[in-house]
Regions:
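A gly/Pro-rich, aromatic-decorated transmembrane alpha-helix motif that marks the paired
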Residues: 38-40, 79-80, 162-179, 461-468
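Extracellular/periplasmic helix-loop-helix junction of adjacent transmembrane segments
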Residues: 44-77, 149-152
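Intracellular loop-helix junctions on the cytosolic face of multi-pass helical membrane proteins
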Residues: 1-18, 22, 145, 176-409, ...
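Primarily marks hydrophobic transmembrane alpha-helices of the MFS/SLC 12-helix fold
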Residues: 94-95, 452
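Hydrophobic core of transmembrane alpha-helices in multi-pass small-molecule transporters
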Residues: 28, 105, 116-131, 316, ...
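Glycine-rich segments within core transmembrane alpha-helices of 12-TM secondary carriers
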Residues: 74, 149-177, 184-199, 354-360, ...
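Central cavity-lining transmembrane alpha-helices of secondary-active solute carriers
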Residues: 64-85, 132, 166-168, 423-438
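C-terminal ends and interior cores of transmembrane alpha-helices
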Residues: 97-118, 398-408, 457-479
Length: 519
């Protein structure tokens, strides 16, 4: 393993192993497909069933329920996928399996029938479970013993995340809105497939890194067990187990019944208690049970661990509220954009937008293409087929971009696409992330609690702009013509809030968790 790591560090691109940039582009195509599909899902489902590009005419609550269910399982399945990769199949095989399943998922959604929509979403969920946790695991193994380089590696990797989100939303969104929804879903699948092939044929560059795990020697296990016994344990009591069972059962009932009742009109329980629906009742039971479990268990820790667990719980609560609000970028915000925002630009305003659109499209792509050329120079002789596939992917992207710009500049009327606003998040991250990094590295770096508070407050201000803009819309109105500036401000403040909370969130939470709780 050590030899493989040293060999990878011999061929460097921008000061890092070429293998990092193989992962960079693989992750970029996966995020392209994920954010591209997500950008058009709700507006497709809730779109009018007539017109040049008809949707399915779902009501908003049904569409958002499907999106929420998808998001829930997207965050749950990596637990299983990570375990399988760690113990059974290896990181690289998990990535390939996940990418293939997600390719099939996007292809299914492109067929545009309810059955294939559900099959597609199920495949995306399972594929994400295999793919998502194991990309960062490969990076972690790649930089074993080189901690001074690891932060820079993750920064580069997450630039790939933002690049993929930016390009995916822009192209899948435009193709879906202007040409056809199935083409938008299909485009996401095409690039997921190309990303899988690019990674598959580049595996030789990693050596044995990420291979199927070998059997762990018993002395390692014994040492680990001995170390853990030195920690003061907090064993589970019968009351703890009972509360856990009630929580799991109630949560599962809610997870299964809520989407079935809203999407499929299949209500497996069909009762109300104190005015609450069955799904809401079990969600409340699960929440209360979990709170009781925390109240019962936390006081049994030692004083230092207890204080850390209390702080950890509070910060987790803040994090849940933040991301629940932030994820509206895929749910309620596209509907707000479509139905309540004036997106028509005339005369000089239309021309200015076209120029801005050209610049924000072409400049990031030129930067990413430069990185591609650097990778080619270092690795073409070793992983030529992977690089050819990657080159073809970029040619397709550039062709779509040129066609998109040509169509937009030829149009006599300028209508800003609904999905265009969603790219602002990635754009603002690229612009402001260096400034926040300098702030965090300066003597004025605030404590984590202040950063969390700032993140939540700034996020709230973003929604405040939208609420202020909509204050004069009559109750029950189906459409309105609000200025686009309110949406731009909302996305700006949401991004600033994310930059306050997200980069340090996981790191800070990991420091709060007692050592005995880390597996």
């Amino acid at each position: 393993m050590t030899t493989d790591i040293e060999n990878m560090f011999k061929d460097k691109v921008l000061g890092h192993p070429a293998g990092l940039f193989v992962l960079f582009f693989t992750e970029m195509w996966e995020r392209f497909s994920y954010y591209g599909m997500r950008a058009i899902l709700v507006i497709f489902l809730t779109g009018a069933i007539s017109g040049n590009n008809p949707g399915w005419g779902w009501d908003t609550s049904t569409a958002l329920s499907l999106l929420g269910t998808y998001a829930l399982f997207v965050y749950l399945t990596p637990i299983v996928g990570g375990w399988l990769a760690d113990n059974k199949i290896g990181y690289r095989m998990a990535v390939v399996i996940g990418a293939l399943l997600m390719t099939l998922g996007h292809a299914s959604m492109a067929i545009e029938t309810p059955t294939f929509l559900y099959i597609g979403i199920a495949l995306l969920i399972v594929g994400n479970g295999f793919f998502k946790p194991n990309m960062t695991s490969i990076i972690s193994k790649m930089y074993a013993g080189k901690d001074e380089k690891k932060d820079g590696a993750y920064n580069i990797f997450y630039m790939g995340v933002n690049a993929g989100a930016f390009i995916g939303i822009m192209l899948c969104g435009w193709v879906g809105e202007k040409i056809g929804w199935s083409y938008g879903f299909g485009l996401a699948g095409i690039f997921m497939f190309l990303g899988m092939l690019q990674f598959y044929y580049a595996q030789s560059i990693f050596g044995s890194l990420g291979d199927k795990p070998k059997k762990i020697e018993s002395n390692t296990t014994n040492t680990t067990s001995k170390d853990k016994t030195e920690e003061k344990l907090n064993p589970f009591s019968m009351l703890d187990y009972s509360l856990i069972v009630v929580f799991i059962v109630s949560a599962l009932i809610f997870i299964i019944n809520d989407p079935l009742s809203k999407i499929g009109n299949i209500n497996t329980l069909n009762f109300t208690i104190a005015g609450m629906s069955d799904s809401l009742f079990f969600a409340l039971v699960a929440a209360i049970t979990f709170i009781i479990l925390l109240i019962v268990r936390i006081p049994r820790y030692t004083r230092i661990e207890r204080d850390r667990m209390i702080a950890f719980t509070i910060f987790c609560l803040f994090t849940i509220f933040f991301w629940a609000a932030f994820e509206q970028a895929a749910g309620s915000l596209p509907i707000y954009t479509r139905d309540f925002t004036d997106r028509i630009l005339e005369g000089t305003a239309g021309t200015i937008f076209k120029v801005i659109d050209l610049l924000v499209t072409v400049i990031p792509m030129l930067v990413i293409t430069y990185v591609l050329v650097k990778l080619f120079n270092k690795t073409f002789s070793k992983i030529s087929l992977s690089n050819v596939i990657l080159g073809i992917s970029f040619l397709i992207v550039w062709a779509i971009i040129i066609y998109k710009l040509y169509v937009e500049f030829q149009a006599t009327e300028t209508e800003v696409p609904i999905t265009w606003f969603a790219i602002l998040n990635s754009l603002f991250i690229i612009i402001f992330a260096p400034l926040f990094t300098k702030w965090w590295d300066s003597k004025y770096n605030p404590p984590a609690s202040v950063k969390y508070g700032l993140g939540l407050i700034i996020m709230a201000i973003g929604f405040g702009f939208l609420a202020f803009a909509a204050k004069d819309i009559p109750l029950g109105a189906k459409t309105a013509k609000l200025s686009m500036i309110w949406l731009v401000l909302a996305y700006l403040f949401h991004t600033l809030g994310e930059l306050c909370l997200s980069p340090m969130g996981l790191s800070y939470l990991s420091k709060l968790v007692p050592a005995s709780q880390i597996v």
